[in-house]
Amino acid sequence: MSVPQSKTWLVDGFCRFTTRMVRKSFQCFAVQGLDQIPSIAASNCSLVVYANHIGWWDPIVAMLLRKKYLPDRVFYAPIDAKALEAYGVFRQLGFYGLKLETFAGASDFLKTSREILSDPKSSVWITPEGVFCDCRDLEQPFMPGLAHLAATTPNTIFVPLAIEYPFWQEPKPMIATRFGEPLSFQAGASKADCGKKIFESLRDTQRHLASSVMRRDFSEFDFVVAPKSQRLGLYDNLRAWKAWLQGRPFDPSHASINGKDSTSPGQRN
């Protein structure tokens, strides 16, 4: 398998399109762990970001995070080979086929990934669980490919990424993400040791994100897409009319019904 193309202009154009999709489908796109980004961006090492795998939106989340926070990194991501055949344009976006159910497929994945990561400006975004999992399932084992990769690419930084799609007060869910502590592995590191550290680091990152999600506090996050409340037809029009009669501004957020502060925050420092 040859190294896939990743045309930056096409990836960025796709990101502009999917940002509109996110705005339409989600209340906001929130992120934590940005204190890790400056050292990662400045590093002369290639990058692997590995995330839990909840559903269809995960690759879009990865692409938008790369564009927003790591724009100088070239985007690559393994994807099921059958899906890649169905959506051939993805080959131009840095996606490459994955057939881990066979020895030859696993070997191709490792060979292609190593070739990609030989470029210090590259980034591979991967979901090592291999199947869709609930974000609270912290026991699902990882497929072995990532541990093999970590043990054989010493000049690469590995960064865990936790993802959730929770509902808060609004009718649409939010995207909640968190970057964890970067890892690197010395030449000669054992596959077992790499696999253990990678697994534990992602699960710890998921736990931290889950705690924040359950607190429902926007001030704990930065935003790729900031929160925005929307009116819901007749019900919210009546609420707006009532607010006008009472001489107060109308807050369309449903948190305001319970007397909670629901103002959309700006970026945190």
Regions found by a protein language model. Name each.
Residues 39-40, 87, 167-171:
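Short glycine/serine/proline-enriched coil/turn segments at secondary-structure junctions
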Residues 27-30, 103-107, 139-140:
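A conditional alpha-helix N-cap/helix-loop micro-motif detector
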Residues 2-6, 107-269:
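Non-catalytic C-terminal accessory region of glycerolipid acyltransferases
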Residues 1-33, 60-61, 88-92:
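A transmembrane-helix-recognition feature enriched in membrane-embedded lipid enzymes
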Residues 31-34, 83, 107-110:
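Structural motif corresponding to alpha-helix initiation and N-cap regions
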Residues 19-53:
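Helix-to-loop junction immediately C-terminal to a conserved catalytic motif
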Residues 41-103:
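Catalytic core of membrane glycerolipid acyltransferases/transacylases, capturing the structured
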Residues 31, 77, 95-97, 158, ...:
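Conserved beta-strand scaffold positions in the cores of enzyme catalytic domains, especially
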